[in-house]
Amino acid sequence: MKFKTMSVHSGQRIDPQTGALTTPLYQSSTFSYFNAQAGKERFAGQAPGFIYSRFGNPTTAELEQKLAALEGADEALVVASGMAAVSAIMYALADSGDEVAYIGPLYGGTDAFLKQTFSRAGIKITAYESDQALLANIRPATKVVLFETLTNPTLKVVDPRVVVEAARKVGAITVCDNTFLTPYLLRPLELGIDIVMHSGTKYLGGHGDIIAGVVAGSHALMKSVRTVALKHIGSPIGPQEAYLLQRGVKTLPLRMDAHLHNAQKVADFLAAHPAVKKVIYPGLASHPGHDALGAFASGFGGMVSIELEGGFERCATLLDNLQLFVQAVSLGDLESLACHPASTTHAAMDEASRLAAGVNDDLIRFSIGVEDADDLIADLAAALALL
């Protein structure tokens, strides 16, 4: 079955009593197990059935089946946020004394979690600047390797195939944050990655109306992640959010095609504009990761970053004069968004680490929406003319 068909039909069950095509919203915190023996068996994991919505909900379960199919995974888990996803993964897979490696930069919230919270559990955090640096220098004590396929916000390409090669040298578990590409453009598990995760808030949801996280992988790994996420940390997604995320995923291919088309046109325009110092978009032949990404993914994503001369003040002038682009963090919405990462999404990083990661004061990140590309270009042209 092709991806577009799976995005609509996978995990969807026509209700046998009513014939309803849409998954109902089961707004129930607890579920009856009807007799004591059935309750005993459900709590022991010996019989199927729902107990309590923190552990699972019928609306959520159908969404998880759809996401597992789209990822090519044994199973998927949806949780309250992308940060809930990454924290559950890390706590499930690493123990005190282990080492966790990552390829930077990461999303600022993930970076802060690893360095300020997770490290307090007695876990060593080691950063690498590229997949090749990881391959050459990975340490034997490494238990988990975390990376983003396109780094946020510098859009550096990290090759999952190289990460897998490096991790297998020391027996480490690989975790790929594929938020920027989605399973429509890349299915990391097919390249040997162990666990894939997303901020479901972004492209998967696609409408800017939910907060969600997604994790997918093998039964063996997901059993531990599910236990930590739902039973120990207690970060389930609500049924309303699950309902909306399932609806959003159905249109993922259509929306991603529009994001990609617009991002390429916007990047081409910006690359030719004299006021722009640098354009960062993997779809440009000038991007150092252009060929690599083209070899393992089926598209270059909907994110474009630029650098201007003049630091925060000049970036603010551009941002404040945009009319269609909305100044806001997050990404993957229908609307085009723009932000200054150094002062927003990555402000929690210490300055030295932030600058070393390429998140400088000249950088602006655009999430290109699904509006008409000509209108977006006109908006950018008018704002750039005021610099």
Say what each PLM segment does.
Residues 1-57, 65:
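N-terminal "arm"/small-domain region of PLP-dependent enzymes with the aminotransferase-like
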Residues 7-9, 13-16, 75-275, 280, ...:
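Conserved PLP-enzyme active-site core in the AAT-like
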Residues 35-84, 109-116:
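Conserved N-terminal alpha-helix of the aminotransferase class I/II PLP-enzyme fold
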